[in-house]
């Protein structure tokens, strides 16, 4: 078990990434708990905690600068109620391959008024009835969900499904649902992120190079998530970003 200590923060790579954001790389350290983040003094736009053993998305100090969190391949099944207060400018939350199980588990994100991009690919929540519709209804500022742009017709359908008296029963049932299973008992599901061939070493190197040359945050997010999933999307990893609506317009204001 590796603790998030002052020494670890100092040792890990810190750099300005391809889209001119200051980033710290905390990947692959077997970190179980988010802690001691205050020592970074809110100096980063991006914190990358991919490939760790984190179970709870909590314990952040107030960070006004941080806007992007990469948490691919962890065991997260809990999002703290105060996340919006602690991270008021959070724009991108990437949670590919975690253990978010119930629609009710995303309730804290509804208070994140600047959240525009989320991915829950590889989480049990994606198999829930009306998953995408509820995400659209509950997170009105989000413009891209799982690399698919939210369309106006979807927003209207989501409102019709969940708004007002007719949607109250469905809302109440969802808001009462929270995940209670101990994530330590859950083994990662190799098929949870969908079909597709496994990435080859050559694919991985090409994707890493593409990340370095990315022109937008949405492109970085898309490529990072493919690396995290370890699989080639059906349309290929190097497809144009606007095919699924994850283009710069969808992400950047």
Swiss-Prot record:
Biological processes annotated in GO: feminization of hermaphroditic germ-line; germline cell cycle switching, mitotic to meiotic cell cycle; mRNA 3'-splice site recognition; mRNA splicing, via spliceosome
Where are the compositionally biased (Basic and acidic residues) regions?
169-182
Top-rank taxon of the source lineage equals Eukaryota
Q: List UniProt keywords, sorted A-Z.
A: Leucine-rich repeat, Nucleus, Repeat, Ribonucleoprotein, RNA-binding
Among the GO molecular function terms of this UniProt record, one is: U2 snRNA binding
Q: Does the keyword Ribosomal protein apply?
A: no
The entry sums up its family as follows:
Belongs to the U2 small nuclear ribonucleoprotein A family.
Q: What is the name of the protein in this document?
A: Probable U2 small nuclear ribonucleoprotein A'
Which organism's genome codes for this protein? Caenorhabditis elegans
Organism lineage reads as: Eukaryota, Metazoa, Ecdysozoa, Nematoda, Chromadorea
